[in-house]
Design a protein with these regions (language model features):
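Catalytic alpha/beta core domains of metabolic enzymes, predominantly
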Residues: 135-151, 156, 178-305, 311-335, ...
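Glycine-rich phosphate-binding active-site loops on the catalytic face of alpha/beta enzymes
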Residues: 63-68, 114-131, 268-284, 392, ...
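Hydrophobic or amphipathic alpha-helical targeting/insertion segments
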Residues: 93-131, 137-157, 162
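Conserved, mostly hydrophobic/aromatic
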Residues: 38, 99, 167, 210, ...
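Glycine-rich, proline-tolerant flexible connector loops at the mouths of alpha/beta enzymes
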Residues: 43, 62-87, 121-142, 208-217, ...
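Active-site mouth loops of central-metabolism enzymes
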Residues: 14, 33-51, 70, 95-103, ...
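N-terminal amphipathic alpha-helix/helix-capping segment at the start of soluble metabolic enzymes
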Residues: 1-41, 46, 155-161, 299-302, ...
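N-terminal active-site wall of soluble small-molecule enzyme domains
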Residues: 71-113, 351-355
Length: 608
């Protein structure tokens, strides 16, 4: 199976075109050769017509091309009529997506008024009880028939009204039926979506796209790769468009890094027709990050140099860290083998940050690049390595994007029968992140980039390679601020699931279903818990998708009703209807009860 033509050359996947709305009146065509489309979601209560109209207009004004609105009930779905009318009255014809969970009847109402209906195969026709049950083939076939009966009316109505569908699977909300047959796996996510796609095709309806969202970027990447490979297996006319997103990415740097790893990796491989960066922030921030991320992809992917070898040097459908020997390239520094992925810094960064770092700090440089015996190799040329115990990297100045260069390095080492540990770099042009083709033509000096762009580029490059299982140490040089460079390295490792040095938060982006102010609550929870290294806390705005979407979180804070919070351990609700004013401290109590609490240390000067 293959999900792209080559791991070394960017060639956009040729998807079929689907039409959303009337292109002559503000609608849009996605797929084919059309540019990748930016989508976001408003946070307003769907019954607040004026608020929904205003938020939508604000998004459109900054470049959002598709706007999603939640429709949790038939009443909410019916009010989409008024929202759409308000937008059209103001001359705004942006396509609207109705977000549906659990309620086929809400979907049937929404399809009357909006251009797209998003359904989640995990909960459109199935309930979620986390129940174990073995299905015979006959029982499974009967369940598929039941789903067909529930989903077919929507398909027929979409076809009649010339609407579009998004079949959007979420890792945290797979049905019990899928879980019991395929497990909590990328294969389960893909097969769940294909079941719904087959029903669409039974009725000769093809105006739909797929999404495969997960809060873990590695899982998300595997899912999309597997989906595209499975579509290829099904046949050439299964080339439906793909919507990319990392769900519950959170806010701030962490949300941007997770999204850049997941979305950026796939865009660099030529996948994706629409994208959304899901942040626990005001929706316009999502659009800004989408724009910035899309602008980096041509600079980070190889679309110029054809590389004859197209063999994958890693398994694209199953994450496994590349096997390397453990080595000690300098005194008191080990990497490779079973060691964690190490953080290396330049001598200049070391000299600036080490005076402010204590031995017990989790964020600290672990080696100086100039002190290591690193073999700098050009993977575009022949080379020899005499020992597996030599730490290697790609030489600066190689005229390839970093992702391509490091993948090619792994392929060449593999052909030589070598499995040397690899040090990853965020760029191949020295300190100051500036790809070769962007340098000034006159004096070849690098132009400093904005920190937000450095963050996205480093996350895409390093994160993509880590998701491939490549890398035993990393070096971030693109960020000129030494302290920020060090923090960025650790944040990328945590977002990629390679190291844990702080609390991990799985936080849904706010929407009309949210029962509390997510940004405020997230800040309060972080203030009390951000020192809990290795603990994962989910913060979910509502009960509709909360328990399932918490994925592998240790604890959950979920809106149960207006002003009331339910607390979870894993996916099990433990405390119910806690007043919101007490809920954060009750969460702390719950963490203490399960022996995951440690007292925070006194604040010290942070790295700068």
């Amino acid at each position: 199976m293959r999900y792209c033509e080559s791991p070394f050359f960017h060639q956009r996947r040729k998807s079929r075109e689907i039409v959303i709305g009337d292109p002559a009146r503000g609608g849009i065509v996605i797929g084919g050769d059309h540019p990748v489309v930016i989508q976001s979601m408003i946070t307003c209560d769907t019954m607040d017509t004026a608020g929904c109209v205003k938020q939508t207009l604000d998004l459109v004004a900054i470049g959002c091309q598709i706007v999603r609105i939640t429709a949790p009930t038939v009443k909410d779905a019916a009010n989409l009529k008024n929202i759409v009318a308000g937008l059209r009255k103001r001359g705004c014809n942006v396509p609207i997506v109705a977000d549906i969970h659990f309620k086929p009847e809400a979907a049937m109402e929404a399809v009357k008024w909006v251009e797209v209906v998003r359904v989640n195969p995990g909960n459109y026709a199935d309930s979620k009880k986390f129940a174990g049950k073995e299905y015979t083939d006959g029982q499974y076939a009967a369940e598929l028939k039941r789903i067909e009966e529930k989903f077919t009316p929507l398909v027929i109505e979409c076809k009649r009204l010339k609407r579009a569908l998004r079949i959007g699977t979420n890792h945290g909300s797979l049905s019990d039926r899928i879980m019991n047959r395929y497990g909590d796996t990328p294969l389960g996510m893909v097969e769940s979506a294909l079941e719904f796609a087959r029903i669409c095709r039974m009725h000769d309806f093809h105006n739909f796209k797929f999404s495969m969202k997960a809060s873990n970027p590695k899982v998300m990447i595997e899912c999309y790769r597997l989906l595209v490979a499975r579509l290829e297996q099904e046949g050439p006319d299964w080339n439906y468009p793909i919507h990319l997103g990392v769900t519950e990415a959170g806010g701030g740097e962490d949300g941007r890094i997770k999204s850049a790893i997941g979305i950026g990796s796939l865009l660099c491989d030529g996948l994706g027709d629409t994208i959304r960066v899901s942040l626990t922030e005001d929706s316009p921030r999502e659009v800004e990050v989408c724009r910035d991320l899309l602008a980096q992809i041509p600079k980070l992917s190889n679309s110029e140099f054809r590389i004859p070898n197209s063999e994958f040097p890693f398994d694209p459908f199953h994450f496994e860290r590349r096997k390397t020997p453990g080595i000690s390239p300098s005194e008191n520094f080990k990497c490779g083998g079973e060691q964690l992925i190490r953080v290396v810094v330049t001598r200049a960064t070391w000299d600036k940050v080490t005076p402010k770092i204590r031995l017990r700090d989790d964020v600290k440089p672990e080696a100086v690049y100039e002190d290591l015996n690193v073999a700098e190799l050009d993977p575009t040329k022949d080379f020899n390595i005499n020992s597996d115990t030599q730490l290697v990297t790609v030489k600066d100045g190689v005229n390839l994007p970093a992702i391509t260069a490091f993948r090619l390095l792994v392929a060449k080492l593999k052909r030589l029968g070598r499995n040397n540990p690899i040090l990853l770099k965020d760029c191949l042009c020295g300190t100051g992140f500036q790809p070769v083709n962007e340098r000034a033509n006159t004096d070849q000096r690098s132009v400093p980039l904005e920190p937000k762009i450095v963050l996205l580029r480093a996350s895409v490059v390093i994160g993509s390679l880590l998701a491939d299982g490549i890398g035993d140490a990393i070096l971030i040089r693109g960020e000129s601020d030494s302290g920020q460079s060090l923090r960025l390295a650790y944040n990328i490792l945590q977002a990629a699931g390679c190291r844990s040095f702080k609390t991990d938060y799985v936080v849904c982006p706010s929407c009309g279903r949210t029962l509390f102010n997510l940004q405020t609550v997230m800040a309060r929870i972080k203030a009390r818990t951000e020192h809990l290294k290795g603990v994962k806390i989910a913060i979910m705005g509502c009960i509709v998708n909360g328990p399932g979407e918490m994925a592998d979180a240790d604890f959950g804070y979920v809106g149960g009703a207006p002003g009331k919070i339910n607390l979870y351990v894993g996916k099990q609700a433990i405390k119910f209807n806690i007043p919101e004013a007490e809920a954060v401290e009750r969460l702390v109590d719950l963490i203490k009860e399960h022996n995951k609490w440690v007292e925070p240390e006194a604040k010290v000067e942070t790295l700068k």
